[in-house]
Each structure stands twice: as C-alpha cells, then as structure tokens.
C-alpha cells in the first residue's frame, strides 16, 4: 500500500513539470505568432508606403545582446551562404549560385588572391575534392545571368586567374642572347626560376590535398614554357669571333708578344752562357771580315737583351747551335770534319739571322735568300737529359776542333788576304788589329773536301729546303730591307727596344756587355782558320749575288779565296738554309741544347709562329664544333622532352575529359533511372489506391446485401434486387417464370462477385 502511494507521488511530481513546460511552450508559440504578424504588418506597411525596409536585426531590442544566438541551426547555414555583390549595388544573394563575376566582386578593392579564393570556397561549404558538381546551365542568384557550374578545382583556377592575366602566369624573361660564358648557366637559372615560381603557385592547391589543382597549374606552366622561343643560333650570337689576319701580320704580332714575354721573363730565367760559346773571327792582316764582325755584334745584342747572372742555374748550360752543326744527327751521315768546320763558323751563320719574333732583328742579305735562321731549341724539363745532350755535343765539338788543328799543322804556308768593305761603325768597335794568315794549300784542300761533301749533302739538304721554302718566302716578304752595318743594326735594336717597357735598360746592358766581350775576345783571339775564311767568303759572295740591289759588299782581294768561292757556294747555301733561328721558341732566355735530339720536331716547328696559331684555331674550331653539336643534342633532347611532356599532358587531359564525360553520362543515366523508378512507384501507389477503393466498395456491397437478407428474409429475390436497382427493367419484361428467376439470380450473383476480380 505504501509502495503504491510512493509511485503515484513520483508520477505526479514528474508530470507537473512536463505540463508546465508544454504550457510555456504553447504560450511562446503564441507570442512568436503575434510577433510574426506584427513583422509582416511592419514590412507590408513599409512596402506600401515605399519606405526603406527595416532590418530584422536592427528592429530587435536584443541587438546589443547576443543576437547571434537567436538564429537557429538551419538559418545559420542559410545566412552564412548569403553574400553581398558589389557589382550590383551590394545585392545580397546565395553565393553558392553566384557566377564568377559576382562571387569575386570584392576583389575590386582587395585585389585577386588565390589563397583567399580557396579559403572562401572552403568556408562556403564547397567540397573541393568532390567530383559530382556537374549540372546543367542555370541562372546566377544575383544577376540572373546563365552560367554553368564546373568542377570546383577548375573554378578555383579560373577564380585565381581572373583579373590578373599577367600575374597568374610565370614570369618568363625574354630570351636573351646567350654568350659562351653564360650558356649553361643562364638557361638553367631561367628554368629554375620558372620551376620555382610554378611550384609556389601549385603548392597553394596542393597543401590541402588538391593534387589535381596543382596538376592543372603544372599544365599551365608547361604550356607557357613551350611558348618560350629558343633558337639554336642564340647561343652563338655573342661569341667573340677571332680576327683573321694575314699570315705576316699575325706572325709578327705573335712574335712581338713572345718578345715582350721573353723580356718580362728575363728577370726570372737568366742562364749562364758558356765561355767558348761565341768565337770572334780575325784575319791575319790588319783588316777584319765585315760579315764576321756584323754577325758578332748582332749576336752580342741578341744575347745581351737578357742580362747574365753567372751564379744562377750553374748546372745548366746554354749553347746556340746552328742546323749545320746538328747535321750529323739530323740528315744522316755527313762527315764529322764538315760539322767541325761549320762549328767554328757559328758567328758567320748567325749574321744571317732574320728578324725573329722575339729578338726583333732584321734579316741580313745572305739570310733573306739563303733562308739562314737559327732555331732556339727549348730545353727538356728533365735536367739530366739536357745535361747529357750538352755534354755529348761538347765532346763532339772538341773532337772536331782537334781534327781541325791537326789539319792546320800540316798546312803551314799561308797566303792571300781577305779585304772587306771598311765600315766606320765597325772600325770604332774593333779593338786592336789582328792579322791571321790564310794558306793556299789549306784553301785547296778545303775546296776538294767541300766538293766531296757537296754530293753527299745535296740530297739530304733538299729535305730541309722543302720544309723551309714556304716559310722563307713569308719571312722575306714580311721583313724590311736588311741592314749592312753595325750602326743600322744598333738603330734597329734601339727602335725595337723602345716598343717595350724595359727595352732601353736591356739594350744598354746588352751594349755594355757586348763591349766587354769584345775586349775579352780581342785578348783571346786566335788566328783565323781556313774554315772560318770559307764561311766569310761564302756569306759575302751570297750577299753579293742575291742582294746586290739592297747593299753592296766590297770585292774580295785574295785570289785563292776567290777560287774557293764556286766550290763552297752551294754547300754554304745548304748549310745556311738548314740553319734556323732559335729565337722563335717560347720563353725569353730559355736554355738551348743541340738540335740533334729533336731534329724533326724542330723542322716541323720551323713555322711555329703560324703553326701554333693554326693549331689553336683548329682546336678552337673543334671546340666550337663540339659545343655546337652538344647544343644541338641538348636542344633536340629538350624539344623531345617538351614534346613528350606536351603529349603526356594532352593525353592526361584527354583522359580527364573522357572520364568527366563518362561520369556525367553515368550521372544522367542514374538520374533517369531514379526518375523512372519514382514514376513506377507513383503508378504502383495509384494502382494500390484504386484496388483499395474497389475492395472497400465490395465490402460495402456485401454488408448491404447481408443487411437486406436479414431485414427481408421472406421477400423474393427479385424484389430485393429491384430495390437495390439491379433489376430496373423487371417491369418491362414481366417475366415470372422460374427459369427466368434462376437466370436472373445467377446473373446477379455474377455481377456481385465478378466485378472486383475483373478489376484486379
């Protein structure tokens, strides 16, 4: 009993608050209905009076308070989807149905910003990764302009690029002319810049998983990159072309540079000259041979352009050796005696030195036509090999001199004298008169020996003549008129030294050293041998024959020497043709050694001034050709990669379009199926409704029939049917037979029971 009371009390206590809450809720609904009516009247009155519509928030007294909480959940999402269009007078419309122009109307004030557009779409509830936003064209919710909704990522790209056609594309600089120095780097920097700018823009869409947005941006950048024009010839537009100068000017120019470099290097490399390197030639009588003295002075000037330091490079010896001295090693098998004869004619052979590229001297008369030059052989890097070569050559020279002295002892009769053209400059230089004797027998023996050597050396010398023939013509044409006196050669040395920075100092030192060596040689002078006389006579005779137009030399006075000239002329020409200038090699005071070690190398480098330039030009052309080939290959690869990229992008785009078309078609079929299903469902529902109505009618008729059976149990069936309206024509027929009654009864039963089934 107590438990029942407790239960009833709990029910009463729980039911009372519910009733109270329901009553309050109904009262609130009543007040809201009244407020709605008042608001409607307020709006209707303002519209009727053509007044400004009141704001539903401003009209609330709770506006200063938390009015945001007055909006329900559904209306919050609805209100948040509305947006003001600045293009149409701040018209408020649903932004989900706006066109692009109305949606981005706020960018007129703030400027376009893809990040802001993405954020806007995200805040508006767009599913950026959704693929099911394809629909038919519809009108804008603001301006009623028809527009077609696209995929939101594509719309994002359009929204980001609208109003900034120039800024949306990567900043591709104009194609500049590429130089050799910047060919690899400028194009690479430009590509890196494009890739960087493109990646920064793509990352905007790829940070939130928008891979397809980034891909579309990549497509845009690849298109713009393919539009970048680049020609194969652009990389070579500003490459400095080498000036092609004549062979003479180019040779002299390069040689002057070498001369300047030699002078600059003279302070660093100053080899010790051998004491017996140069030998002065004296005749027995009071006169000196002009060509011998001229060669001696020119050699001294050539040597003294590089000051000598006696204590530097003590283990290295330098020696100027003519090609005729190297003949036993170069040309095969001449006699040692002939080589020894030429060894002591070193100064006479050097008289014919041409204006070498480094020394800046002119050709003597005998040198221009006889192609007498000296080759400066560069020393090997290996000092041991160089010292061995010098030692061997020195031993050979000593043996030759011993043989010559032995020959001199056999011929004691000396006759004849050599007369030379007197020169005022040479008379001032020559200190003391030396009078060596010349033997007639010695001259005859030399004539026989030289004639015997001539036959064996002609074939060998022809080989060297072929090498130097072309160079001799260029050198002879390129040089100025030779000098015939020491004063002229000295003036040329002064002119040449004035062109360089340190020319005057070097020339003065060379002049002093030359005078000192003249004193020393005058003190140590020996009688002139027949070999030296032969060289002097040959030089004078060749100078007379070949260069009579430029200068004249005084005829010889000795009959014996004049007899020797025909036999010695050809051999001396050959020896002078083989002789090469050693001033054409690199480096100013380079140490020289015998030409026998590298004879064919020296022959091939006789035109080193031009051959070096040609080799460098060939290397340069080869480098240009290889660079051009590499650029062509690079361009082909780049074009092939660009074409492949474009094809891949086009294929992917085509696949995307096909996929989108298939997706739209599938959506259309699905929508059609849904509509058909809805139509079928409606038809089925209508059929069910009709069936239910028929069944209800049948039930009503059955109930009515039972009612009449109960009410009129004794009444005949005809009356019942007549009263129901089934037999309305019974009075017309007046058929009362039992057979008719039975048929009527059967027909009635059939109508009552068969009509529903027929409809079913």
Curated annotation (Swiss-Prot):
PROSITE patterns: GTD_BINDING (PS51775). The chain crosses the membrane at residues 26-46. Disruption phenotype: No visible phenotype. Myob1, myob2, myob3 and myob4 quadruple mutant has a significant height reduction, a reduced rosette diameter and a delayed flowering. It is a single-pass membrane protein. Residues 388-416 form a coiled coil. GO terms for molecular function: myosin XI tail binding. It comes from the Eukaryota. Disulfide bonds: none annotated. Residues 385-394, 730-741, 750-760 have a biased composition (Polar residues). It is found in: Endomembrane system. The keyword NADP does not apply. The keyword Ribosomal protein does not apply. This is Probable myosin-binding protein 4. It comes from Arabidopsis thaliana.
């Amino acid at each position: 009993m107590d438990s029942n009371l407790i239960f009833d009390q709990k029910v009463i206590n729980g039911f009372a608050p519910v009733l109270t809450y329901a009553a309050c809720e109904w009262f609130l609904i009543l007040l809201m209905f009244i407020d709605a009516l008042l608001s409607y009247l307020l709006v209707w009155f303002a519209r009727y009076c053509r007044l400004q519509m009141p704001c539903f928030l401003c009209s609330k007294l709770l506006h200063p308070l938390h009015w945001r909480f007055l909006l329900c959940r559904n209306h919050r999402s609805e209100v948040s989807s509305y947006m003001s269009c600045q293009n149409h007078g701040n018209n408020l419309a649903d932004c989900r149905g706006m066109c692009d122009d109305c949606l981005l109307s706020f960018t007129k004030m703030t400027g376009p910003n893809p990040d802001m557009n993405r954020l806007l779409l995200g805040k508006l509830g767009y599913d950026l990764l959704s693929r099911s936003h394809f629909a038919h064209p519809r009108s804008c919710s603001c301006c009623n302009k028809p527009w077609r909704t696209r995929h939101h990522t594509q719309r994002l790209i359009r929204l980001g690029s609208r109003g900034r056609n120039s800024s949306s594309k990567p900043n591709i600089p104009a194609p500049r002319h590429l130089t050799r120095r910047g060919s690899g780097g400028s194009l690479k920097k430009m590509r890196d810049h494009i890739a960087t700018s493109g990646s920064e823009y793509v990352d905007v869409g790829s940070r939130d998983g928008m891979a397809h947005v980034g891909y579309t941006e990549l497509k845009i950048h690849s298109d713009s990159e393919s539009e970048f024009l680049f020609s194969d010839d652009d990389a070579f537009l500003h490459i400095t072309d080498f000036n092609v100068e004549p062979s003479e000017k180019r040779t002299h120019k390069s040689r002057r540079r070498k001369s300047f470099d030699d002078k600059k290097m003279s302070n660093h490399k100053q080899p010790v000259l051998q004491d017996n390197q140069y030998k002065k030639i004296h005749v027995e009588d009071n006169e000196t041979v002009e060509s011998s003295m001229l060669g001696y002075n020119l050699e001294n000037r050539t040597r003294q352009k590089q000051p000598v330091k006696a204590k530097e490079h003590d283990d290295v010896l330098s020696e100027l050796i003519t090609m005729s001295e190297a003949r036993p090693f170069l040309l095969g098998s001449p006699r040692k005696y002939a080589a020894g004869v030429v060894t002591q004619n070193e100064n006479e052979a050097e008289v014919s030195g041409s204006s070498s590229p480094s020394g800046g001297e002119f050709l003597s008369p005998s040198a221009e036509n006889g192609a007498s030059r000296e080759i400066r052989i560069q020393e090997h890097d290996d000092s041991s090999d160089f010292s061995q070569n010098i030692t061997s050559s020195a031993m050979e020279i000593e043996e030759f001199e011993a043989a010559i002295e032995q020959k001199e002892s056999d011929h004691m009769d000396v006759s004849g004298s050599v007369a030379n053209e007197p020169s005022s400059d040479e008379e001032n230089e020559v200190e003391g008169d030396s009078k060596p004797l010349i033997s007639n027998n010695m001259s005859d023996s030399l004539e026989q020996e030289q004639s015997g050597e001539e036959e064996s050396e002609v074939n060998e010398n022809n080989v060297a003549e072929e090498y130097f023939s072309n160079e001799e013509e260029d050198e002879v044409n390129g040089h100025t008129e030779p000098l015939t006196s020491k004063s002229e050669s000295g003036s040329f040395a002064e002119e040449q030294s004035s062109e360089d920075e340190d020319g005057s100092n070097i020339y003065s030192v060379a002049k002093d050293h030359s005078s000192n060596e003249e004193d020393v040689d005058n003190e140590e002078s020996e009688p002139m041998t027949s070999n030296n006389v032969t060289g002097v006579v040959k030089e004078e005779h060749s100078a007379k024959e070949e260069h009579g137009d430029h200068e004249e030399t005084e005829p010889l006075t000795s009959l014996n020497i004049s007899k020797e000239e025909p036999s010695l002329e050809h051999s001396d020409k050959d020896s002078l043709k083989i002789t090469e200038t050693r001033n054409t090699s690199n480096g100013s005071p380079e140490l020289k050694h015998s030409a026998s070690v590298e004879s064919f190398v020296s022959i091939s480098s006789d035109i080193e001034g031009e051959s070096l330039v040609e080799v460098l030009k060939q290397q340069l052309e080869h480098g240009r050709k290889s660079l051009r080939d590499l650029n062509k290959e690079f361009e082909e690869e780049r074009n092939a990669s660009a074409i492949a990229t474009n094809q891949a992008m086009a294929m992917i785009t085509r696949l995307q379009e096909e996929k989108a078309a298939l997706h739209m078609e599938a959506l259309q079929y699905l929508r059609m199926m849904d509509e058909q299903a809805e139509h079928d469902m409606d038809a089925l529902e209508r059929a069910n409704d009709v069936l239910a109505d028929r069944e209800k009618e049948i039930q009503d008729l059955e109930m009515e029939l039972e009612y009449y059976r109960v009410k009129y149990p004794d009444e005949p069936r005809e009356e019942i049917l007549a009263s129901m309206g089934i037999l309305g024509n019974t009075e017309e027929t007046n058929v009362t037979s039992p057979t008719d009654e039975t048929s009527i009864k059967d027909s009635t039963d059939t109508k009552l029971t068969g009509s529903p089934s027929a409809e079913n």
